[in-house]
């Protein structure tokens, strides 16, 4: 679609994949949405096509998750359309000892949508694994 319609048209469709409904509907986040939409629209078409194709064509790594032996934190937004909770939970169960954190009111870009929650969860995780490395 990007090749034929261009970034401006496609970027409107991408926003609900990247961001949760809370972010997309919050009046106080209007400037943030505008900035992100502008960034999406300014992406080069060729690079975006290659990146999208890479995501679609990549091989799954689920079978390899069980070999991870390092402390692992999986973060998912409760409004994530790109990687829904059930996929994140599946990864969590596949990685022994991993921690799964759900960010309330966030989609796939939880670090932008709810940075305070993400930083809190990340800080707690890092505190627990202090000395591991």
Where are these regions (language model features)?
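Hydrophobic "lid"/C-terminal helical patch
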Residues: 14, 52, 91, 118, ...
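Active-site acidic short loop of glycosyltransferases
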Residues: 69-70, 97
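Short beta-strand/loop motif that positions the catalytic acidic residue
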Residues: 68, 74-76, 80
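Solvent-exposed polar/charged
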Residues: 66-67, 92-94
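Conserved alpha/beta-hydrolase "acid-adjacent" motif
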Residues: 81-87
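Conserved alpha/beta-hydrolase catalytic His-Asp/Glu region
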Residues: 7-67
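Catalytic active-site module of serine/aspartate enzymes centered on a nucleophile-bearing elbow/loop
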Residues: 96-133
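Conserved loop-to-helix N-cap of the C-terminal "lid" that shapes the substrate pocket in Rossmann-like
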Residues: 45, 85, 112-115
């Amino acid at each position: 679609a990007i090749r034929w319609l261009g970034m401006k048209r496609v970027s409107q469709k991408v926003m609900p994949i990247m961001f949760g409904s809370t972010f997309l509907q919050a009046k106080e986040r209007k400037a943030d949405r505008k900035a992100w939409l502008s960034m999406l629209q300014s992406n080069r078409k060729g690079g975006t096509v290659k990146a999208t194709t890479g995501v679609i064509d990549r091989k799954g790594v689920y079978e390899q998750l069980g070999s991870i032996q390092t402390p692992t934190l999986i973060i998912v937004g409760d409004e994530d359309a790109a990687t829904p909770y059930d996929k994140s939970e599946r990864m969590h169960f596949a990685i022994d000892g991993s921690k799964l954190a759900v960010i309330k009111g966030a989609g796939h870009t939880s670090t932008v949508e709810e940075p305070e929650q993400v930083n809190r969860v990340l800080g707690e995780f890092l505190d627990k694994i202090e000395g591991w490395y």
